[in-house]
Amino acid sequence: VPAFGQALLPHPLQLDSTQMEKTGLSIAEEAAQLARFRQYELALPRAELATQLAPKSFQTWALLGSLYIQTEELEKGVAALQQAQNLDPENASILFALGSARFQQENYAAAIQELQAGLKLKPNVPGALFDLGNAYYKLNQFPEAVAEYEKAYAQEKNFWPAINNIGLVNYEKGDIEGAIQRWKTAVSIDDKAAEPMLALAVALYTKGDQEQGLAMGEAALKLDNRYGDIEFLKENLWGERLLQDTQKFLETPRIQASLAQNQEAPTPPVMSP
């Protein structure tokens, strides 16, 4: 650049560390707002910039970690959350997020470790207790899973997923009646909850109450037709025994007709926990 041109260039801003951190936190808030509207592609570069401007702020790293996880970049997410945890070791929410990320990585033992550490700092958080139960469930540690689900339900009586998953455990252990009672309770809490409704339908149908089972199955799939997909059920921790019975149930002409009818229906939005 010739000398004249150089004279026209703006002087670089001399920001002190306090001003940089303030700017970083402001950008992080902007990224968080975008994330609330699920605009992750716009939020992510802002969150990355925020960690550069405010590298000693656990908030910026925690936000970046959560965004990486939302966009399924799990390794980057775990690394960012670990950085946040190093900056604020007593923050239970960061440990809970780490536990959730480890679960998604299928590292269930590490998930248990992170969640237990978080619960020591902040006990009786229903979502964390539920996640801990799920990690035990994936390791086939059923008594421990049920204990955590029961704790979660004790903390929040409307928390039907915990009761639902106790039903999943019951069914895999061959306690069909116990599973039916749990799923009935879950549906009584939320009569729009498609998962326990379909599980209950399958259990009733398999037990011999075919008419009630089919009618309930139709209602469940009308609420949310994703539950007609075996892979989706696996993601929701349905075990082998229940999946086998569900496969037979889904292949019945009446349920096949219901699935075809619902195929054109829009999928319900996924609600944030």
Where are these regions (language model features)?
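Terminal, low-structured helical/coil segments at or just beyond the last alpha-helical repeat
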Residues: 7-15, 219-273
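TPR/TPR-like (Sel1-like) alpha-helical repeat modules
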Residues: 184, 188, 194, 198-229, ...
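Structural marker of alpha-solenoid helical repeat scaffolds
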Residues: 53, 87, 121, 155-156, ...
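Structural signature of tandem alpha-helical TPR/SEL1-like repeats
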Residues: 36-46, 70-83, 104-117, 138-151, ...
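Ligand/cofactor pocket segment of small-molecule handling proteins
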Residues: 122-173
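Alpha-helical segment of the N-proximal tetratricopeptide repeat
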Residues: 20-59, 63-73, 100, 104-107, ...
